[in-house]
């Protein structure tokens, strides 16, 4: 870091999720879009001077109560949403800034420069949790979250062992 307040910040969504080609995680973590919006809005509020905030996404998943209102407020407050997956990030030696390359919705190659890039990393179960589930005899889904019945979400395949929190699947607090 150069200890300077950035003038432009980019958030890259779905890092490590919704991607069976690179990481094998096909599921949506379901919280990252809203976290990125909140962080971008707070960053703009606390910035000294203008701050350009951009959220690069495959699509925005705002499916909770009033989340769509929050999304619309973010747009109104100047958060820019770009529907694309950034395919490369390079350091610009002359400034230390980051150059992002992506293909826009029209199919054109775009290059933009940012002072800070935030990776919105998908939620996943740790190796230790997978090992513990194995020792306890708790079956897991292919996503490695607890395999439970949608109508009995805390029950697991092992009687007396219950799932809670993100062991059930990605979720907001």
Task: Identify what each model region corresponds to.
Residues 1-173:
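Residues forming the flavin
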């Amino acid at each position: 870091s150069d200890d300077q307040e950035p003038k432009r910040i980019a958030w890259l969504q779905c890092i490590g999720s919704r991607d069976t080609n690179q990481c094998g995680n096909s599921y949506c973590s379901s919280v990252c879009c809203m976290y990125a919006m909140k962080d971008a809005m707070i960053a703009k509020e606390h910035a000294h001077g203008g701050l350009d905030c951009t959220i690069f996404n495959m699509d925005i998943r705002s499916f909770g109560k009033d989340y769509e209102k929050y999304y619309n407020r973010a747009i109104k407050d100047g958060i820019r949403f770009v529907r694309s997956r950034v395919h490369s990030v390079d350091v610009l030696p002359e400034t230390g800034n980051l150059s992002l390359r992506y293909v826009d919705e029209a199919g054109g190659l775009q290059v933009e420069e940012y002072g800070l890039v935030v990776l919105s990393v998908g939620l996943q179960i740790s190796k230790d949790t997978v090992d513990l589930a194995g020792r306890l005899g708790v079956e897991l889904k292919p996503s490695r979250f607890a395999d439970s019945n949608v109508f009995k979400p805390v029950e697991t395949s092992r009687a007396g062992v219950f799932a809670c929190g993100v062991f059930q699947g990605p979720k907001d607090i």
